[in-house]
A protein has these predicted regions:
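Flexible loop/turn segments at secondary-structure boundaries
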Residues: 9-11, 34-35, 77-79, 104-106, ...
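Residues that form generic nucleotide/phosphate-binding pockets
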Residues: 55, 129, 194
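Membrane-interface junctions of multi-pass transporters
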Residues: 185-196
């Protein structure tokens, strides 16, 4: 199984469980504090960066050589997302992923046509920086650059296209179940809850 978490409820018991039972752990961090705290807030509206980063560092250190990824989302506020990836690397994380926001075009977080030039340039900057880090003996992994040219796509990816409902599910803090985190809140896609 894979556990994806925003880190808010991580404690020693969660770390022990995740490292014992989960083949992979995905830790949600959008990068720099000011970027992360724009959208990742608690019920009181306070940013979560200061609370989760030490928990993530502790979990990753305890995890040893088991799989994990730091997974962030870039938006209109940070089309220069390599700064956020490099920040994660500076925090000691080496397994990185950063994906574009998925939202309605009128949402203030939505990427614009003007952002795309900046975004495209980021991938070139990232590749060059990864080579530099490799030469310095401090490599990082970027999930979206991982290619398997010999094995090809897995059969379930050929059939289903993504893991929604077959490979993973989203569980809300209230226990509602959805086939994917992108469906959370869409009543038509609610599968049930953990209570029934």
């Amino acid at each position: 199984f894979t556990l994806t978490t925003n880190g808010m409820l991580i404690d020693d018991d969660v770390i022990d469980f995740a490292n014992r039972e989960m083949s992979n752990v995905v830790l949600s961090l959008d990068g720099r504090k000011e970027i992360h705290d724009r959208l990742r807030v608690d019920y009181a509206g306070n940013g979560s960066y200061e609370r989760i980063v030490p928990k993530f560092q502790k979990l990753v250190e305890a995890r040893g050589n088991k799989n994990y990824y730091m997974r962030g989302t870039f938006t209109h506020a940070n089309p220069d997302f390599t700064k956020d990836l490099f920040h994660m690397a500076d925090l000691g994380f080496t397994e990185l992923s950063m994906e574009p926001v998925v939202c309605a075009p009128e949402d203030p977080a939505a990427l614009t046509a003007e952002d795309l030039k900046i975004v495209k340039d980021q991938y070139e900057l990232l590749a060059k920086d990864m080579l530099r880090r490799e030469k310095e003996g401090k490599p990082i992994t970027f999930y979206h650059y991982m290619l398997d040219l010999t094995g090809g796509p897995c059969i379930y990816k050929r059939i289903s296209g993504c893991g929604s409902g077959t490979e993973y599910m989203a569980v809300t803090p209230w226990g509602d179940l959805y086939p994917c985190h992108q469906f959370v809140g869409e009543e038509a896609y609610k599968l049930g809850d953990i209570w029934n």
